[in-house]
Amino acid sequence: QRQMCIRDRGMRCHGLKGGIGSASRVVELDGKPYTMGALVLSNHALFDDLIVAGTPIHTLLSDSIPPHEDKGSIITVLATDIPLSERQLRRLCRRALVGLSRTGSACGNGSGEIVLAFTTANRMPHYSEKALLPMEMLHDDAINPLFRAVAECVEESVLSSLLHAETVTGNHGQTFRSLTELLKNRA
């Protein structure tokens, strides 16, 4: 059971209640499992653009979502234990937009897409008797599975933020509906 946190209280994603969502994938490299994870704070995109598993959601729901602009932003944090260079982490950040587009986000003019990535690999000692330290790094030819994992994680994180959100009414009387509630009402 996920609980809404104070930070995601007023988030609107695709015109519905958004907020915090997360997902992860295990990627095997040289016979060893590594984890790629994504965490999003979703506050972006239009309802009519929302796609789940290739289906435009607005075609399934008769509920009317008030018109709104594609303003706000989505903040994405990618975390992994795969040994990556700073350049490779930047490349993963760019692939996060693939996951957003799978949910129907057009990354509009009023929307900001912020993506940060880090790795916990290659921990450096605070003190060392050696001037040069060894560092592992993924070969670029092996990075494609990570691109796919990032796209899948970001897509699932956005959907997670929508499915785990609860309908809320804000200070100004504006209600942000929960996708889960809308889907239950359809059944």
Model-derived features: positions:
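Hydrophobic alpha-helical bundle architecture
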Residues: 76-148, 171
